[in-house]
Amino acid sequence: MAPSWWGRSGGGGVGNGGGTPVVVKMENPNWSISEVEAAEVAPGSPAGAGKAGRGKNARQITWVLLLKAHRAAGRLTGAASAALAVASAARRRVASGRTDADAAPGESTALRARSYGCIRVSLVLSLLLLAVEVAAYLQGWHLEEVASLLAVDGLFAASYAGWMRLRLDYLAPPLQFLTNACVALFMVQSIDRLVLCLGCFWIRFKGIKPVPQAAAAGKPDVEAGAGDYPMVLVQMPMCNEREVYQQSIGAVCNLDWPKSNFLVQVLDDSDDATTSALIKEEVEKWQREGVRIIYRHRVIRDGYKAGNLKSAMNCSYVKDYEFVVIFDADFQPQADFLKRTVPHFKGKDDVGLVQARWSFVNKDENLLTRLQNVNLCFHFEVEQQVNGAFLNFFGFNGTAGVWRIKALEDSGGWMERTTVEDMDIAVRAHLKGWKFVFLNDVECQCELPESYEAYRKQQHRWHSGPMQLFRLCFVDIIKSKIGFWKKFNLIFLFFLLRKLILPFYSFTLFCVILPMTMFVPEAELPAWVVCYIPATMSILNILPAPKSFPFIVPYLLFENTMSVTKFNAMISGLFQLGSAYEWVVTKKSGRSSEGDLVGLVEKHSKQQRVGSAPNLDALTKEESNPKKDSKKKKHNRIYRKELALSFLLLTAAARSLLSAQGIHFYFLLFQGVSFLVVGLDLIGEQVE
């Protein structure tokens, strides 16, 4: 028989007696108390009935509370297990780490050692100062004036008084001057960012977008009007990019354009014989399908990508083509790409370049790709679109763009003098008076670097090259015939503010000056510079990618962390150091952009394999390579500069506690943790 407290009868509960009935829903896994209701004790009931009922109810409540406690303990255990798993994974990744990450093929060992040594000396000095400040804080001397400290007996008190006088008279004034200068640069750059965002808002509000005078895309039958389509040359430079060549070649060969009016050049600079054989076989397969496609492999591989493109443009048949389209090896254009870009040249003889924006197939792969997506969305949505709409000039992105061949030739063609040949040709074309068009609604999908090592090398090239180019073309800009405001935009905004000042103040202000002001509190860095303005700028940066809003704090911290790499790259490019000439092909993973596109490529591949004999040597090598690759182990790289800066910032955070600077403390703490995560290579994928 069920106990009396199990349910409630119509007679008013437990034998119509007193007590506090408790209904427990047993089917509820939460074991929650669903009803606790006091009932009046019926007249004439035994005196102990109420107490007995309350005793039983108390026991039931105890059991429910115990079950809740058990569940809470289970949650804590799960959280602890997850934390241990993360710590264990971090330990394994760190244990397999390599400390050669800071090495660059062209960088001198002495220069690299000096850079790391300066950071290490700063760290040791900050630790010593922290120990001194803690001891002085315990003595209460941080509240005393220098004169009162001199009256205190003891060597330590006199030494600390001398340190305070040194700070006040000699260290604080120049540090405050440098702080004010960096804050001024920070404000100028923030105003520039705000103006760009206002320009983007105006473009959206007014619906401003480039409109072609005549759209070839309106014709339903491609072959019917082939004579109305201009001749287009498609170039695909690649180098040892085995993971992506097949899908990118397939995407280009399926472009919706009369086959007689476009030619594909696969410009293979691979030094791996197996990769070259596979690419050549893929080209031959599409040739048998009727596509006009040519395979080119240079014997003398000089000049990197610029040399490859320059060699291809020297072919005799190039004179028969009016436009040239460039796709890097990981880019997968939509079938209507040419129909949406080439018409913008018609009737506009002064247009030299039409640039499409990038989209990314792996933007949600990990935290690193998400943060890159925020940066590049702002770059295309705001910077490129605004500059294209109002100035008719922006930096060519190196791929997913259509050039008028006449504009290339008029600008001097491709040059190998820097590692940013795309920006080089864009600046020279702008100086010749050519106009650029940016199409924000035409996207070409590609990959983002998934490992920090690959991303770091890419960013080094992207930030050292512009400084090389600025040195080389500064005189040409001054002597050019373009207007004063175009010269001002090119020199001050395009090069100095966005390529030099931005990485300079980011590193100097947040990684050098801010920690120093903690140990020299007489020099002040306002809280609005540390927190409020950067937060506002981060919100503006993340607006073009609203789905990434939850990552706004990691984005802000990661951008400051990357300032070390960007600052080093800027210095190497400005002073022509060895690492400024380093060119490393960004590692690809071979992710597909569209399922139907891949299916189409696979369909053609299957048909071709049935009807033709494969290259047995290439296939044999291809089958043997996975076995070799399976033996490769992924490992982490240890970045010593980032680790040293992490400990420096954490030390400064501890010092800020003594000054009761809350905002500075939290910023330094989280920024130090961010440097630690990056220094241990715990962001992004591991490298093989």
Curated annotation (Swiss-Prot):
GO MF annotations in UniProt: glycosyltransferase activity
* Root EC class: transferase
Query: Which residues carry out catalysis?
Result: D269, D422
| Compositionally skewed regions (Gly residues) per UniProt | 8-20
Q: Which GO terms describe its cellular component?
A: Golgi apparatus; Golgi membrane
Could you tell me which residues belong to the region Disordered?
A: 1-25, 604-635
Indicate where this protein resides in the cell: Golgi apparatus membrane
UniProt key word Lipid metabolism:
no
Keyword set, alphabetical order: Cell wall biogenesis/degradation, Glycosyltransferase, Golgi apparatus, Membrane, Transferase, Transmembrane, Transmembrane helix
| Primary subcellular site in the record, as a coarse category | Golgi
Which residues span the membrane? 121-141, 183-203, 500-520, 525-545, 638-657, 663-683
> Does the keyword field hold Iron?
no
Q: What is its EC number?
A: 2.4.1.-
One of this protein's GO BP terms? cell wall organization
Q: What functional role does this protein have?
A: Probable beta-1,4-glucan synthase rather involved in the synthesis of the xyloglucan backbone than cellulose. Seems to work simultaneously with xyloglucan 6-xylosyltransferase. Xyloglucan is a noncellulosic polysaccharides of plant cell wall and consists of a glucan backbone substituted by xylose, galactose and fucose.
Family classification: Belongs to the glycosyltransferase 2 family. Plant cellulose synthase-like C subfamily.
Q: What is this protein called?
A: Probable xyloglucan glycosyltransferase 7
Q: What species is this protein from?
A: Oryza sativa subsp. japonica
Q: Name the encoding gene, please.
A: CSLC7
